[in-house]
């Protein structure tokens, strides 16, 4: 297999083309079926989280260890020299990358991962989320989960629900799935609609999409229902209660759904998916979170091995 991801920075999902996305999905499936504990032997990966994280950090660190590698790093950026002594991000990255083979980071500042890649001593930087900008490895695990449940990525009907304006996961996933000719349904309050630049990109590619204000309008057409949280703090109490009734998923909402429908969510869930939905055959968000390990194993293996 030709591996064009070897020694590559992974900053934005748009850094990867269709063939590279398919390669990560394939390798993730291979590693899920047949674990390989030697792919990161004698490799050290920095896990540097300047912002709180549970699933992303733990799944990355699990991925490194399952592949036979070693992890160093921190999960509280407030206790680093950068925070305590005024060290610049550029200096911090330059020093830490001199110790390791790859540098995984999360940072609250948009563009921090791209900046880090400029000072990484040529070591690959993997973006674990930079502010509201990009979260490419979430998109990779989403793609793997979609492929796992549908057997394909091409031509699917996918709805995004909730906070589409600020949600970095939906922006990246829409961009990635547009490479596979998917049809999109954007279900959100007007104040949290999908950003214009995403819609313009889809228009330029000839991708079909439509805007909706309730899940019930389209649930019977969908292959994938991608839920996100509508943040209460963005609305007054009366408006939020009205929004909540339209953008909370329960069993009744799923009446008429196709058998192959699967519900995804980047998590954490608050109250936008009723607990009762967990027990339906449509729920796939916990398996999706587990798939984060395999998608990140695949990415690390490809970035750190010329051939696998």
UniProtKB/Swiss-Prot annotation:
Description of how the protein assembles with itself and partners: Heterododecamer (2C3:3R2) of six catalytic PyrB chains organized as two trimers (C3), and six regulatory PyrI chains organized as three dimers (R2).
Name this polypeptide is given: Aspartate carbamoyltransferase catalytic subunit
Gene name as annotated: pyrB
UniProt GO molecular function: amino acid binding; aspartate carbamoyltransferase activity
Keyword Transferase: yes
Biological role stated in the UniProt entry: Catalyzes the condensation of carbamoyl phosphate and aspartate to form carbamoyl aspartate and inorganic phosphate, the committed step in the de novo pyrimidine nucleotide biosynthesis pathway.
Family recorded in the similarity comment: Belongs to the aspartate/ornithine carbamoyltransferase superfamily. ATCase family.
Provenance organism: Laribacter hongkongensis (strain HLHK9)
GO BP annotations listed: 'de novo' pyrimidine nucleobase biosynthetic process; 'de novo' UMP biosynthetic process; amino acid metabolic process
Residues holding carbamoyl phosphate: 55-56, 106, 135, 138, 267-268
Binding residues annotated for L-aspartate, in chain numbering: 85, 168, 229
Entry's EC annotation: 2.1.3.2
Catalytic activity: carbamoyl phosphate + L-aspartate = N-carbamoyl-L-aspartate + phosphate + H(+)
SUPFAM superfamilies named among the record's database cross-references: Aspartate/ornithine carbamoyltransferase (SSF53671)
Pathway assigned to this chain's UniProt record: Pyrimidine metabolism; UMP biosynthesis via de novo pathway; (S)-dihydroorotate from bicarbonate: step 2/3
Keywords, ordered alphabetically: Pyrimidine biosynthesis, Transferase
NCBIfam families: asp_carb_tr (TIGR00670), PRK00856.1 (NF002032)
PANTHER family named in the record: ASPARTATE CARBAMOYLTRANSFERASE, ORNITHINE CARBAMOYLTRANSFERASE, MITOCHONDRIAL
Listed InterPro entries: Asp/Orn_carbamoyltranf_P-bd, Asp/Orn_carbamoylTrfase, Asp/Orn_carbamoylTrfase_sf, Asp_carbamoyltransf, Asp_carbamoyltransf_Asp/Orn-bd
GO cellular component annotations of the record: cytosol
Top-level taxon: Bacteria
